[in-house]
Amino acid sequence: SAGEKKNHNFRASFQTGFRNPTTQDQYIGLDLGPFALIGSAEANLDRYIEVMNVSAAGQALGFAATKELTGRDAYNTPVYSVPSVTRFAQTGNVADLEITSVNLVKPEQVKAFEVGYKTVLENGLSVDANVYYNIYNDFMSTSRVITPYYGTVGSDYTTDGSTDLIGLQAIANGDRRVFQVYTNTSETVSSMGLGLGLSKKVYKDFELGANYSHSQFEFDQSKDPSFIAGFNTPKHRLKASLGNTKLFKNFGFNVNVRWNSEYLWQASFADGMVPENTVLDAQINYSIPAIKSVLKVGAANLFGKDYIQVIGAGAIGQQLFASLTINP
């Protein structure tokens, strides 16, 4: 603390932590149609089995009508990254194909740094600010890869053998499986942000407040194209509030406005952009001293349109509520 009245408070912290893979990360085996979601536990790889139909073009090359795949076709074996196969489909250039091998997932580690400042100024303005920076090792999320039903995954297309070319033909025939797998990236991942909160009584018992947060995620996608980071956090959030617990006898109110910028949502179910949202919430309180109770009536997303916070989930609409709290 600093200042004559010790009202300037500074804080700083350094922490280390880790995040273990969840049960789903390790043991899920789910066919989602366009791709299969495979957990990374060693015991799970043989547990997941699916039989895929081979195209007529593939059968004409002499391959069976079906192909059995297991979780081992997704992990610890050469596979193609999904973005590179997409480019190959557009250009026909085999040099666009990128070969990778997915390792089993392991715990993620983080080093977290934070500094902050808090004060109440002589004019009654309360200030709370903080800045943070996180460094991740073995950042844990998912990756999407492709394996052909026949042929081999390889980069030497000039050999006398035809297995590599047959693998390319499998991709061209649509005889390939997309796997979404749980793994770690070896690339550097960091996140940083800041927060600022202000509050002040502006007139009699009216309380005005505002909060802003900035969140930023740094990951070079070009160095690990198939990795899906899934930060899923808006870069900017803003909240403003106005309230008075003593508007007049036994009555109070509070109004909040919340806004966030658009952000990318990435998950095993769906990916997409979540649009920016502005939400207005309001509440009035009425105290009933005779029965030691408080009646609250309010609305969330008042006058607003339905909005989403997660791709693939239902939209959030308006909510009206009322409650009576009794304090005997």
Residue ranges and their predicted role:
Residues 1-25, 29, 112-132, 211:
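Transmembrane beta-barrel strand/turn architecture of Gram-negative outer membrane proteins
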Residues 15, 106-108, 118, 132, ...:
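Surface-exposed loop and edge beta-strand positions of immunoglobulin-like domains
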Residues 19-20, 25-41, 137-147, 220, ...:
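Short acidic-glycine motifs
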Residues 101-103, 183, 270:
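Short, P/G- and charge-enriched loop/turn segments at secondary-structure junctions
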